[in-house]
C-alpha cells in the first residue's frame, strides 16, 4: 500500500542508495515554497530542500488497476516513481543544475529510471524495513508516464507533453550506467 510507512521506507532506501550530503526532508501535505509546483501529488521545493507528499492523492494513484478495469496497469510503483522523481530532483538541485525547463523534466525521468534499477537490488536499511522492486513494478512506472507524466516534470510542475518522449527518457535511464 501507499502510506506513510511505505513512503518513509522509500525515502530511506533512496538515502541509502545515494547518500546525499543534504538529504531532502519529507513532509505530508502542502508545503510553502517560493515557486509554483503544479498539481503533482509529490513536489520538491529547492529553497527548503523538501519533498511534499499529498498522501491521499498519491495513494489513489497507487491503487492497483488492470486491464480488467479497462485501465492501464497501475499500482504502488506508479505512486512511488513520482516520489522517486522528486528525490532525484533534490539530487539535481544539489548539483546546481537547472530545474525549471523541459530538459530538467526529461533528465528527472531518466534519473528516476536509474534509481528504479538500483531499487531492484536488495539493500539493508537502518530501520530494518525493506523495499525492493520487481519486474512488474516497471510496468507500473511506465503506466504513470503514459497517463499522468508526473515523473517527467520540472520543479514547477511543467511537463513534457509527448508520452513517448517521457518514456524514451525513462528508458535511457534504465539502459545507462549511473554516471549517465
Give the role of each language-model region.
Residues 4-15, 84, 88, 105, ...:
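Extracytoplasmic/secreted envelope proteins and their assembly/folding machinery
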Amino acid at each position: 500500500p501507499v502510506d506513510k510507512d511505505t513512503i518513509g521506507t522509500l525515502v530511506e532506501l533512496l538515502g541509502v542508495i545515494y547518500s546525499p550530503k543534504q538529504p531532502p526532508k519529507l513532509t505530508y501535505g502542502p508545503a510553502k515554497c517560493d515557486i509554483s509546483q503544479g498539481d503533482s501529488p509529490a513536489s520538491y521545493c529547492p529553497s527548503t530542500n523538501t519533498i511534499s507528499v499529498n498522501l491521499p492523492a498519491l495513494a489513489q494513484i497507487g491503487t492497483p488497476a488492470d486491464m480488467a478495469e479497462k485501465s492501464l496497469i497501475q499500482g504502488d510503483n506508479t505512486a512511488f516513481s513520482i516520489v522517486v522523481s522528486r528525490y532525484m530532483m533534490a539530487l539535481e538541485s544539489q548539483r546546481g543544475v537547472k530545474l525549471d525547463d523541459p530538459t530538467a523534466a526529461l533528465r528527472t525521468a531518466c534519473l528516476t529510471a536509474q534509481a528504479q534499477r538500483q531499487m531492484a537490488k536488495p539493500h539493508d536499511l537502518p530501520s530494518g524495513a525493506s523495499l525492493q522492486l520487481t519486474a512488474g513494478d516497471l510496468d507500473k512506472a511506465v503506466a504513470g508516464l503514459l497517463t499522468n507524466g508526473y515523473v517527467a516534470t520540472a520543479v514547477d510542475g511543467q511537463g513534457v507533453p509527448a508520452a513517448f518522449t517521457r518514456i524514451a527518457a525513462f528508458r535511457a535511464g534504465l539502459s545507462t550506467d549511473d554516471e549517465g
